[in-house]
Amino acid sequence: MEGLVQMFQKKIKVPKLLAVLVIISTHTFANESFEGQSGEIISIPAAIQKQADDLTFKTSEGIKQLVSLPFVKQDLVITRHHVDVKVNWVNFGESRITIADESKVTLSKENQARANKEGAEIKMALSNSTKEITPSFNFIAPVPGIVTSPFGKQRFVNGLPRSAHLALDLRGAVGTPIVAPLKGKVVLIGDYFYTGLTLILDHGHGLFSSYAHMSEIKVKLGDLVEQSGEIGLVGATGRVTGPHLHWTVYFDGNKVNPESLIQAGYLNSIL
């Protein structure tokens, strides 16, 4: 009998380590339920076969990773990374603004071509995030002003429906200093049709933030800015109705609600 077992093992030749990996990789999260609100970040158990440089967090419940949930217009179940997540619709309300310059509402072919080109530049800047910075997710507000237009509102410009407002507008007079809410590297500076003087910071591991309508930019492309370091001044450039900071945060491929990120103890609240 012992001889037969040895002969069988020689024919199969399955390395013990491979066998263990096969068993581990069959683990699923079928018995676990995950859900969150539109435009928010949640935590899920880290993937078993994660990359060495993946951003993970040790908790009392095990190793977790963060995932972003997209803005949705109805409850939706989606797959994020290796789990299914229910994204709950949120009624963020609506915003109606009037822009006197009709050329900035109904774009000419030239302006549309410019806007498309600039959109591609922004998309390119967001396509590759550094792993040399590890974000703490302990954000501070970039300006002290109150929120004038929150995340998620359905916008109407001159009575016409437009895309939802997936950013946070903060009040500020022209010249008000804007600071980095988190350590980051300057990966884009531009003067764009919609957003005027614009700056993007890469905070590492797929976390970016954008600052629009600035009157002046105080940093250079490639600069590494520490948290609370000044990056520019509030302005009214681009398509605006008045001076303010238009602050957008991107994580894990989605625009997320910046107002949530500046709450005290934010990271611990989602782990």
Walk through the language-model features, giving the residues of each.
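Non-catalytic extracellular/periplasmic "stalk"
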Residues: 31-146, 150
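Sterically constrained small-residue positions within well-ordered secondary structures
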Residues: 21, 33-35, 48, 69, ...
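Sec-dependent signal peptide recognition
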Residues: 13-20
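Catalytic cores of peptidoglycan-degrading enzymes
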Residues: 140-271
